[in-house]
Amino acid sequence: MAAGEISTPQEYISHHLHHLQVGTGFWSINVDSMFFSIALGILFLVIFHRVAKRATSGVPGKLQTAVELIIGFVDGTVRDMFHGKSKLIAPLALTIFVWVFLMNLMDLLPIDLLPQAWAGIYSLLGYDPAHAYLRAVPTADVNITLSMALGVFILVLFYSIKMKGLGGFVKELTMQPFNHPVFIPINLILEGVSLLSKPISLGLRLFGNMYAGELIFILIAGLLPWWSQWLLNVPWAIFHILIITLQAFIFMVLTVVYLSMASEEH
């Protein structure tokens, strides 16, 4: 369903908020989010692998310079925030920052560019283009952001048990903040809520900001005439560059902070 074929702004907005899915109900899979998140992850690996293979001690090219700046920035951030010893944290932080940034960056593409291209392919395959749904911003899908946050949560549990031992981890859950056996149920509730709130807030924060940004672009395109859209699109896109970068940075920083807290022995 191309923009020009949609009769009302409500239909336009609804169409652009619908995922390309397989399955129904709880077990449905958002194929578009999966595709773009995996594709952008592969793009990150290819670019950084290529730069690493061609790295030179001489005058670096523009791409190598950009990659070195990103690596230096992330490494410095990790050194300031993570006080334990692990060779995994810096590469993990780099992967999270660049991957989330690339997924966020998809929000700056013209809102109809990829959906209209997909509608054309859908039509050529003999299907009704009115059902050619496509959303290109993976981080505007709560399933993607919460899945990433779940991965961080698993790492937090791993580091907590690794550094404190299973007994120390259980003691931390049951004997804090009130160090008395009678308060174990209360401690367990308080610490459990605190532990679970970290990945949930981490995922929902990224999703909320990116979903809101995508929705604003859709509203501008769906409610305003084409000749006036640039008056709002350009300023919002410029401001949104800051948002997508900041959200990638926040997700990375909170991941490092949570892992640093998990690795500290009490």
Curated annotation (Swiss-Prot):
Pfam family, one: ATP-synt_A
Transmembrane segments: 28-48, 88-108, 141-161, 206-226, 237-257
GO molecular function: proton-transporting ATP synthase activity, rotational mechanism
Assigned keywords, A-Z: ATP synthesis, Cell inner membrane, Cell membrane, CF(0), Hydrogen ion transport, Ion transport, Membrane, Transmembrane, Transmembrane helix, Transport
Membrane association type: Multi-pass membrane protein
Cellular component annotations (GO), alphabetically ordered: plasma membrane; proton-transporting ATP synthase complex
Assembly with partners or alone: F-type ATPases have 2 components, CF(1) - the catalytic core - and CF(0) - the membrane proton channel. CF(1) has five subunits: alpha(3), beta(3), gamma(1), delta(1), epsilon(1). CF(0) has three main subunits: a(1), b(2) and c(9-12). The alpha and beta chains form an alternating ring which encloses part of the gamma chain. CF(1) is attached to CF(0) by a central stalk formed by the gamma and epsilon chains, while a peripheral stalk is formed by the delta and b chains.
Name listed for the protein in its UniProt record: ATP synthase subunit a
